[in-house]
């Protein structure tokens, strides 16, 4: 008879523990119920990206010395650098530079290790196309700067909740929103 009593006690303890776990999970669910929704109406509302966001790469053709450091540090050997050695000035001359963003993992190693800072990350993340071959950007397409989201009057920008409060008397421009 003694084992039967301990079995009922274990069953009772397990039932109380299960009820406590169910109650805790229900309280977590209720605490999330009164929060504002995170979703936004994307084409018309865009959230402002953080300062260290890794978007499309911007390339400045005039600064590049064709050293190919970006190719060596890239984990997938992605940037294609075509150059020719000019014997009269004894320097490399850059002919073509391209990056395929369909393959790029946006790690930022090329930007970090570039000795002349000719590569930089932009805040552009809208790279979707119907043809994957359109994601292969040459030096001309990489040299174009994206339109900033903050300055666009047709799009309502949604600020993240963890951003600092911006003074109401300051106009919204790209210099105002820097601390994320």
From Swiss-Prot:
It catalyses: a plastoquinone + NADH + (n+1) H(+)(in) = a plastoquinol + NAD(+) + n H(+)(out); a plastoquinone + NADPH + (n+1) H(+)(in) = a plastoquinol + NADP(+) + n H(+)(out). GO terms for biological process: photosynthesis, light reaction. [4Fe-4S] cluster 1 binds at residues 64, 67, 70, 114. Residues 55-84, 95-124 form the 4Fe-4S ferredoxin-type domain. The keyword Iron-sulfur applies. It is a peripheral membrane protein. Keywords: 4Fe-4S, Chloroplast, Iron, Iron-sulfur, Membrane, Metal-binding, NAD, NADP, Plastid, Plastoquinone, Quinone, Repeat, Thylakoid, Translocase. HAMAP family: NDH1_NuoI. This is NAD(P)H-quinone oxidoreductase subunit I, chloroplastic. It comes from Amborella trichopoda. The gene is ndhI.
